[in-house]
């Protein structure tokens, strides 16, 4: 709506007024609520801002802070010019006017990231303020603050209860059609790099390697790379596995620029309730697309307007079991002699040497489970690797064999136990599928978020923590239980190894990459 000025404006001020009015970024309600002296005057809020407000350092909306903008662009206020008009003319289409603690990203990227965060179902502005009470509510855009300051400062940006409710809603939702995110016959990049951080978790390296192999099987030119690669020599398309880890460790920080991120695909492996997931949020929200190891998480990114797909790599025929050099490792020497030889994943349930195995880090939820059931487990032949992790499981001499050890032990185990780190029930694909099912072990798990391929009581067995001992006792000690276990074990192996399933996954991921690659920037 046009403003009829009750007082004379200079030609420059009149042009400024028209520029601001046309942008739609002046928030009259905000201006009047914050500057109540203007509300009591007879001058319209926009006219007041153009004539007086910008000279007094007043904000025209929640996002534009004149002092911050002038620190970044000192010339914007030269000759008594309005810095907000400079912003509108220089950064058209943006609503964020400063970089906060993310100086290596363009304002255009940050604006997209903040708007996407607003739509992400895990984020609620009022809840972010409730968690971070030191933030001034009236003058702050919560999504902008969360992206530019909250994540870099290590603040929590999602509420735990709301994350739980959102996951439940995502499980119940119909979801968006995969066909909207797949271009079967579209263009693909000439070269692709799948990146992992060499200083990070060794399991992430495995996922990245499997993804790279799957992309090659899809007919794409793909190479496995790490953070030590020269960014100037990067392939046409970069896929960063575990961005919460890659961009925070060592030389990975050199890759955290808007120029790289906006054209890349992120492969998210982290759970939404964790601080690690929140650390990866800026890279996920400003990327060209997201691949997620969790079906529900992919749906959440789609709801936020991001091209996203749920995908897990094919698992090849080769297995990475213990090597000769691993045999002197302390955790290998405690294995029974019969379990030190190379396992055969096709060994039937009844013929395996270990009854139950578990690999995982310490958490309060797991601590309660194992303390409560210690007496029960003591009667079986177990291998439990359970410790407090303060750093990633990396390639150090202490940790290097652990990934191979987990697969090796699962290859000798009847049952692989899956106890969640907390109460969220995330489907831990690497532990459940890659680590256990692919090595012929039967997974007994607490209830998980629904998975589109692997179903409870078909490919794995699911029970509440309280009744898991009863289920295990039935599986190990009764003919009916052993028959059911073998049925489940074989069904899981078929789901992993059937060539048609693997070809379908290849077609799907190629189609998604083609969709992202051939979709023009907004």
Where are these regions (language model features)?
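Charge-rich, low-complexity intrinsically disordered regions
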Residues: 1-177
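Extended catalytic core of nucleotide-activated donor transferases of GT-like folds
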Residues: 176-183, 191-306
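Catalytic binding pocket for nucleotide-activated donors in carbohydrate/polymer assembly enzymes
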Residues: 189-226, 278, 295, 302-303, ...
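Short hydrophobic "strand-cap" motifs at the C-terminus of beta-strands
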Residues: 267-269, 358-361, 460
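Carbohydrate-associated surface elements
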Residues: 296, 315-318
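Short hydrophobic/aromatic-enriched beta-strand-loop microsegments
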Residues: 308-314
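Conserved catalytic-core segment of nucleotide-activated headgroup transferases in glycan assembly
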Residues: 319-415, 476, 482
């Amino acid at each position: 709506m046009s403003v009829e000025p009750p007082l004379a404006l200079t030609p420059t001020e009149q042009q400024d007024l028209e520029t601001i009015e046309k942008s739609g970024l002046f928030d009259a309600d905000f201006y009047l609520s914050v500057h109540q002296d203007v509300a009591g005057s007879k001058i319209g809020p926009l006219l007041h801002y153009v004539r007086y407000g910008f000279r007094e350092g007043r904000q025209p909306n929640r996002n534009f802070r004149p002092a911050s903008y002038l620190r970044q662009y000192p010339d914007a206020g030269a000759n008594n010019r309005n810095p907000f008009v400079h912003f509108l003319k220089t950064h058209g289409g943006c609503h964020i006017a400063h970089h906060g603690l993310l100086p290596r990203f363009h304002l255009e990227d940050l604006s997209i990231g903040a708007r996407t965060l607003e739509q992400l179902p895990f984020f609620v502005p009022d809840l972010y303020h409730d968690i971070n009470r030191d933030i001034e509510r009236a003058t702050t855009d919560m999504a902008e603050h969360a992206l530019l300051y909250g994540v870099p400062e290590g603040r929590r940006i999602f509420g735990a209860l709301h994350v739980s409710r959102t996951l439940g809603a995502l499980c119940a939702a119909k979801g968006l059609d995969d066909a909207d995110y797949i271009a079967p016959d579209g263009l693909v990049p000439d070269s692709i790099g799948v990146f992992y951080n060499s200083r990070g978790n060794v399991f992430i390296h495995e996922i990245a390697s499997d993804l790279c192999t799957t992309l090659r099987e899809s007919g794409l030119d793909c190479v496995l790379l790490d953070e030590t690669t020269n960014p100037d020599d990067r392939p046409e398309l970069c896929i960063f596995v575990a961005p919460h880890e890659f961009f925070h460790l060592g030389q990975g920080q050199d890759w955290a620029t808007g120029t790289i991120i906006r054209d890349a695909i992120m492969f998210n492996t982290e759970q939404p309730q964790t601080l690690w997931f929140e650390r990866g949020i800026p890279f996920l929200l400003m990327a060209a697309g997201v691949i997620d190891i969790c079906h529900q998480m992919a749906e959440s990114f789609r709801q936020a307007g991001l091209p996203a797909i749920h995908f897990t790599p094919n698992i090849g025929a080769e297995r990475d079991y213990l090597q000769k050099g691993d045999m002197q490792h302390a955790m290998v020497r405690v294995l029974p002699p019969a379990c030190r030889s190379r396992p055969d994943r096709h060994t039937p349930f009844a013929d395996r040497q270990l009854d139950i195995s578990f690999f995982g880090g310490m958490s309060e939820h797991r601590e309660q489970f194992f303390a409560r059931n210690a007496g029960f487990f003591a009667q079986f032949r177990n291998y439990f690797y359970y410790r407090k992790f303060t750093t990633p499981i990396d390639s150090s001499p202490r940790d290097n064999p652990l990934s191979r050890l987990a697969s090796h032990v699962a290859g000798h185990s009847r049952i692989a136990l899956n106890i969640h780190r907390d109460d969220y029930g995330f489907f831990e694909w690497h532990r459940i599928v890659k680590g256990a099912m692919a090595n012929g072990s039967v997974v007994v798990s607490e209830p998980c978020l629904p998975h589109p391929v692997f179903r409870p009581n078909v490919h794995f067995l699911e029970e509440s923590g309280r009744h898991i001992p009863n289920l295990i006792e039935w599986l190990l000690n009764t003919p009916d239980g052993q028959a059911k276990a073998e049925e489940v074990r074989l069904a899981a192996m078929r789901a992993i190894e059937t060539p048609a399933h693997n070809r379908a996954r290849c077609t799907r991921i190629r189609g998604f990459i083609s969709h992202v690659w051939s979709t023009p920037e907004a």
